[in-house]
């Protein structure tokens, strides 16, 4: 195929997804490639519109399957995903050829800070990981479900309470002024891959692979690979209470078991056998909490 062809980049149509995909497209065009966006409706978006809690949907890839399918069936050449939404199981015929430079991986409270939250205050979040982490430091807090796009979530801050969001999502849309408190990522360990975008293409598409090599950030790729190795060893999806965050020479991990037992680890990463260390940590953490 011609190297002059237009690279069609599939993405969800939410404001955050559009902005993230547009940044990837801009990087490709700056490098001399022609690019256009292809918007795809996903199961996750449909359930979000219906207000269905994410952890009740079942299955994995609810925000990614339809976007990947657009590439596999030829409607697009590339697929852009929030990396935290991308399952660790590979899809035949596709591979991640770029991890974009990571934004902040932290979570943040919007509304009141932890210190400002009165006893029994309400936190709105759809993430079981965030609920488990906040409950560990404030067992008095109440939790209610929260889904929707960023604008919708910001309209649903409980009276006297807070919502929890990824700092990166607010950065993308220029809304960091709404943050009451950024949470320490060594205690409130972020979701795997939080803060970066994964871009897939077909494994036999040499033009797309070459184009994406200029978008890939090696440091982010290394960090997310370690985090995903931890998650893959657990056999877990994004709807379960798991976090992993690599920064510097440490992989920070969080796991909550079915009985409420919590395991936290800081694994030194010295440059050798790094993926093996992440996998070993996952096995030890799972044994510590007694399984799901």
Model-derived regions: residue spans:
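A conserved helix-loop-strand patch within extracytoplasmic ligand-binding domains
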Residues: 83-86, 90-141
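Paired acidic/hydrophobic, glycine-rich loop segments that form the ligand-binding mouth/hinge
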Residues: 72, 77-82, 161-166
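Helix N-cap/beta->alpha junction signal
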Residues: 13, 64, 127-128
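Small-molecule-sensing regulatory modules
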Residues: 2-41, 47-56, 136, 140-292
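Short, structured active-site "lid" loops
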Residues: 50-78
């Amino acid at each position: 195929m011609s190297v002059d062809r237009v690279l069609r980049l599939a993405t969800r149509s939410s404001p955050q997804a559009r902005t993230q995909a547009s940044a990837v497209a801009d990087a490709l065009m700056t490098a001399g490639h022609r690019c256009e966006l292809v918007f795809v409706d996903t199961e996750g978006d449909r359930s979000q519109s219906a207000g269905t809690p994410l952890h009740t949907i079942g299955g994995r890839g609810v925000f990614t399957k339809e976007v990947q399918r657009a590439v596999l069936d030829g409607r697009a050449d590339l697929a852009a995903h929030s990396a935290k939404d991308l399952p660790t199981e590979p899809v035949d015929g596709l591979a991640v050829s770029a991890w974009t430079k990571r934004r902040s991986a932290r979570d943040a409270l919007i509304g009141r800070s932890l210190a400002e939250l009165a006893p029994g205050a309400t936190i709105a979040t759809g993430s079981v990981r965030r609920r488990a982490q906040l409950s560990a430091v404030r067992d008095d807090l109440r939790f209610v479900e929260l889904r929707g796009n960023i604008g919708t979530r910001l309209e649903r801050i409980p009276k006297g309470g807070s919502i929890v969001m990824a700092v990166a999502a607010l950065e993308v849309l220029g809304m960091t002024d709404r943050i009451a408190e950024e949470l320490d990522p060594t205690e409130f360990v972020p979701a795997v891959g939080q803060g970066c975008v994964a871009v897939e293409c077909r494994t036999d598409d040499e033009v797309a692979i070459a184009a994406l090599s200029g978008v890939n950030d090696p440091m982010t790729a290394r960090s997310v690979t370690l985090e995903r190795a931890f998650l893959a060893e657990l056999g877990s999806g994004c709807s379960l209470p798991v976090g992993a965050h690599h920064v510097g020479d440490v992989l920070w991990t969080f796991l909550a078991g079915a009985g409420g037992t919590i395991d936290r680890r800081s694994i030194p990463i010295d440059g050798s056998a790094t993926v093996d260390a992440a996998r070993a940590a996952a096995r030890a953490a799972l044994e510590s909490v007694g399984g799901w």
